[in-house]
């Protein structure tokens, strides 16, 4: 989802046997992301499947990206079959949450 929809490029892709996980390092415009894909991931609990309840869960698991054009971003997501979980306006800005293929919520804010 991150590569296809946000334009990040993978510059390193490793498999770590002790973790039983693949780690992909992505880059775009000087920003880097490190994503893990486990062989046997745990399912997301029901209370983490909606933005409001997920954001109340203690822990580091939230990421947000800024966009200049929410309509164009959403159109690309819809064309690629991305699950749009929630849309709202906050302080005059368009906000959208999408789910990645594993159900993890990712936030986008139009500035």
Predicted regions and their residues:
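Vicinal oxygen chelate
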Residues: 14, 24-25, 33, 65, ...
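Eukaryotic phosphotyrosine signaling hubs
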Residues: 60-62
């Amino acid at each position: 989802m991150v590569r296809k929809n946000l334009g990040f490029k993978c510059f390193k892709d490793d498999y770590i046997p002790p973790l039983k996980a693949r780690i992909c390092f992505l880059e775009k415009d000087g920003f880097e992301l490190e994503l893990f894909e486990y062989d046997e991931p745990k399912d997301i609990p029901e209370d983490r499947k909606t933005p409001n309840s997920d954001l109340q869960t203690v822990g580091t698991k939230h990421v947000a990206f800024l966009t200049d054009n929410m309509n164009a971003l959403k159109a690309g997501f819809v064309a690629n079959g991305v699950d749009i979980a929630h849309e709202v306006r906050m302080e005059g800005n368009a906000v959208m949450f999408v789910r990645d293929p594993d159900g993890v919520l990712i936030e986008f804010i139009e500035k």
